[in-house]
């Protein structure tokens, strides 16, 4: 890697890289990364009938190099920010007035990040389909790429849901996977038992769209059930109770076989496009829209479903944060005693945080069930709660954009280990590289807690201001007038 964005000269003044220097640094980083990854990742060797053959994977190497360059750019924008560096450096001239500077690169790009990510998310499946049907450089990337994007969006939605409880309200929840499970089993049971029993088999094509709001409602009710016993708890005690709640739900799903089928699990029917199935029949999606049948059409449909659900989660959370309930969550997070002294009902504030966060988890769970087409209690162990919490913590508590970047990095690293099959020849026999994904997540958390304890996006601004912020000279501040 090249030198950081700022370097100290002999006179002690910091040098800020220009845009051209940053671009040169990114090009240099990409070239070095590509050269390193070419012999390691791009060339895959395999024993085939006693002979050693090699399979080129230059697309994967270039993609990983692009991820490294993107991460480097994020560090330039978010970590090596000149304003953040200046705030940490001691001021040698105490009497020098504080002069308002122009907006930093992060401030200028901040409002544009969300719309840019949304446009990229809409175009992403078509990009994967295009490269999947290209000249063979990326075989199978249409299915794999869209499936990876679905996983990332699913965990982004889960992260935003948990962010309501942990990031905004400051309530440490280690049992969030319980609401995820409630949503998944709600859809599975509604689609396989109750909806056909109540309305007949003709309701099955619409079971998913009917079950999503029901799953959100039932999960929110369970969130309130969890919220009542922990109203007076905080910190470690709250974490232990929520952890126990998640384990209770897992044990119920595992042992209440007459209702949940236990370890055998439940098969789940596929979703349809408002009653139009994705199959080869004359009434299928491809026939009605005069398209050639391809299974990728169903996965593209699932991608846009989870994109819409995630977008709803983002917009609702953003709107609630600006309402009185959102400001009450932030007040509760900062100081519960001061929150009570201001007349805020902490009971309803906590319960609404648990209920709304659980509702988003239930919606994500119902989508998980229809995507997997099979669910069992093994999908809802504590490790899932830890994984979601890691995404929230690494992204930055209270930061929605930070959770997006964190989910992409963590899920991307997890999937990358599936591709590092060359490690099988280095590691002991029988060792799967994918088993080291949690080791990488743990190492990332240790490094983040050491160097950026507030996450990828650390900027926490108040939701509302009483007055516009003004520049104040240092001499007034030293006299206590600022």
Positions of PLM-derived features:
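Transmembrane alpha-helices and adjacent helix-loop boundaries
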Residues: 2-482
């Amino acid at each position: 890697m090249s030198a950081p964005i700022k370097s100290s000269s002999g006179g002690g003044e910091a040098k800020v890289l220009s845009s051209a220097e940053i671009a040169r640094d990114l090009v240099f980083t990409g070239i070095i990364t590509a050269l390193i990854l070419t012999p390691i990742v791009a060339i895959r060797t395999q024993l085939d009938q006693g002979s050693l053959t090699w399979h080129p994977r230059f697309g994967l190497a270039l993609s990983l190099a692009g991820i490294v360059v993107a991460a480097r750019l994020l560090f330039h924008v978010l970590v090596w920010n000149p304003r953040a560096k200046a705030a940490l450096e001691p001021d040698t001239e105490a009497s020098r007035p504080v002069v308002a500077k122009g907006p930093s690169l992060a401030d200028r790009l901040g409002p544009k990040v969300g719309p840019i990510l949304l446009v990229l998310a809409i175009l992403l499946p078509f990009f994967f389909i295009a490269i999947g049907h290209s000249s063979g450089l990326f075989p199978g990337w249409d299915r794999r790429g869209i499936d990876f994007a679905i996983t990332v969006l699913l965990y982004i939605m889960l992260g935003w849901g948990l962010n309501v409880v942990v990031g905004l309200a400051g309530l440490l929840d280690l049992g969030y996977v319980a609401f995820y499970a409630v949503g998944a089993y709600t859809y599975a049971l509604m689609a396989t038992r109750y909806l056909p029993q109540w309305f007949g088999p003709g309701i099955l094509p619409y079971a998913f769209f009917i079950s999503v709001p029901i799953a959100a409602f039932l999960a929110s009710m369970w969130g309130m059930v969890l919220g009542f016993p922990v109203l007076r708890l905080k910190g470690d005690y709250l974490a232990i109770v929520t952890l126990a709640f998640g384990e209770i739900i897992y044990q119920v799903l595992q042992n209440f076989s007459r209702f949940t089928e236990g370890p055998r699990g439940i098969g789940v029917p596929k979703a349809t496009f408002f009653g139009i199935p994705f199959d080869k029949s004359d009434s299928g999606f491809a026939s009605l829209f005069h398209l050639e049948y391809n299974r990728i059409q169903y996965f593209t449909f699932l991608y846009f479903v989870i994109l819409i659900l995630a977008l709803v989660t983002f917009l609702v959370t953003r709107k609630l944060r600006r309402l009185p309930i959102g400001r009450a969550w932030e007040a509760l997070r900062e100081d519960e005693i001061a929150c009570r002294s201001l007349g805020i009902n902490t009971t309803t504030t906590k319960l609404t945080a648990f209920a709304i966060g659980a509702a988003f988890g239930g919606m994500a769970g119902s989508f998980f069930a229809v995507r997997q087409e099979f669910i069992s209690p093994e999908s809802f162990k504590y490790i899932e709660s830890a994984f979601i919490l890691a995404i929230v913590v690494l992204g930055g508590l209270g930061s929605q954009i930070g959770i997006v970047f964190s989910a992409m990095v963590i899920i991307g690293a997890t999937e990358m280990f599936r591709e590092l099959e060359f490690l099988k020849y280095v590691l002991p026999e029988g060792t799967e590289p994918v088993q080291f994904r949690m080791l990488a997540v743990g190492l990332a958390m240790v490094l983040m807690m050491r160097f950026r304890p507030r996450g990828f996006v650390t900027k926490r601004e108040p939701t509302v201001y009483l007055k516009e912020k003004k520049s104040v000279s240092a001499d007034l501040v030293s006299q206590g007038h600022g």
